[in-house]
From Swiss-Prot:
This is Ornithorhynchus venom defensin-like peptide A. Residues 1-22 form the signal peptide. One of its GO terms (molecular function) is toxin activity. Produced by the crural gland and detected in venom from the spur located on each male hind leg. Is the only OvDLP that is expressed in venom gland alone. Disulfide bonds join C33-C63, C40-C56, C48-C64. Does not show antimicrobial, myotoxic, hemolytic and cell-promoting activities. InterPro entries: Defensin_3, Myo_ane_neurotoxin_sf. It is found in: Secreted. Keywords: Disulfide bond, Secreted, Signal, Toxin. GO terms for cellular component: extracellular region. The keyword Ribosomal protein does not apply. Coiled coil: none annotated. Residues 23-24 form a propeptide.
Length: 66
């Protein structure tokens, strides 16, 4: 009984039960840096506070906030 409940809970979380979407949360992918008001900076910048799950157009840069 507990295993069934845990499996149903997992399915509800991964597939956002009730939202009408069958797309799992982890398939949404990364957002552009500007979506989070971040700034694309060189990867060697030591003052960069990296924003996870974002991307920059230039692969030599990463999304930062200051």
């Amino acid at each position: 009984m507990r295993l069934t409940y845990l499996l149903l809970l997992l399915v509800a979380v991964l597939f956002q039960a009730g939202s009408g979407s069958a797309e799992p949360i982890f398939f949404y992918g990364r957002q552009p840096c500007s979506y989070y008001d971040g700034v694309c900076r060189d990867k060697s910048d030591v003052n960069c506070k990296y924003i996870a799950f974002t991307y920059c157009e230039n692969p030599n840069q990463r999304c930062c906030y200051y």
